[in-house]
Amino acid sequence: MRHHGRMHARESDVAGGPARDSAGGPARDSAGGPARDSAGDDSPSAHRHRRVTSFRSRRSALSGGQQDTWERLWPELGTEARDDDGRPAALIDTAAWFGRTAPLVLEIGSGTGTSTLAMAQDEPDIDVIAVEVYRRGLAQLLTGIDRAGVRNIRMIRGDGVDVLEYMVASGSLTGVRVFFPDPWPKARHHKRRLLQPSTVALIADRLRPGGILHAATDHAGYAEQIAAVGDAEPLLRRVDLTDDLPISVRRPVTKYERKALAGPDVAELLWEKVP
């Protein structure tokens, strides 16, 4: 098996960091998904069985300030992956949503948005869609966007697989980021891991030629699985952190991650879609 890649993250002074159950850092979190276990698809096959999801259900209330920011900014900057009846959203017109045409990055499982915000600020010419299941994490990102005046981030609340399947066009993405998805360490739960062959194949289809899949995990077993699945996908080929890439792969190190650096190494895994 190829070398997985050691951590190449830059230090960040972004306040805070993801909670232990956020995907924005080594906190073991959702990879993005709706607050339900069912995929909610309209197709007959979807009604016959529930799709296994990669997130853990939980509820969290917003603070008064977060609620005010949510009500003010979410209608413009956010949307849902599914409607109240469970129907998937339509394909996104990203040019209309962002008000411009620019390279597009999808981050699945943005957590509290620490990495999302910092990387978007570093790349103002790239548009970023952050996908997260937890409303509180999205509200924290909205607050950061509001304070920093960032204009190149949009958000989707829901399942990252739904977003890939229904809302993103084939060949439209310059990059996909999956940072610290829930490793589901117990063997009987491995089927819940986000980066399965079917999901990686879907990501590869949505990437444009030369587009980048960037995954990071501090769970050794999950790193091995991600490496094997990515290397087995015929539309992807491994690239190095030092290569000339169309998007930045320098993610910020959150305060939580700095505390965790004495523990397991972080594996950074990158693939490029073949021409």
From Swiss-Prot:
The keyword Methyltransferase applies. The active site is at D182. Substrate binds at K186, D218, T254, K255, Y256, E257. Keywords: Methyltransferase, S-adenosyl-L-methionine, Transferase, tRNA processing. The keyword Endoplasmic reticulum does not apply. Residues 1-73 are annotated as: Disordered. Catalyzes the formation of N(7)-methylguanine at position 46 (m7G46) in tRNA. HAMAP family: tRNA_methyltr_TrmB (MF_01057). Belongs to the class I-like SAM-binding methyltransferase superfamily. TrmB family. This is tRNA (guanine-N(7)-)-methyltransferase. It comes from Mycobacterium sp. (strain KMS).
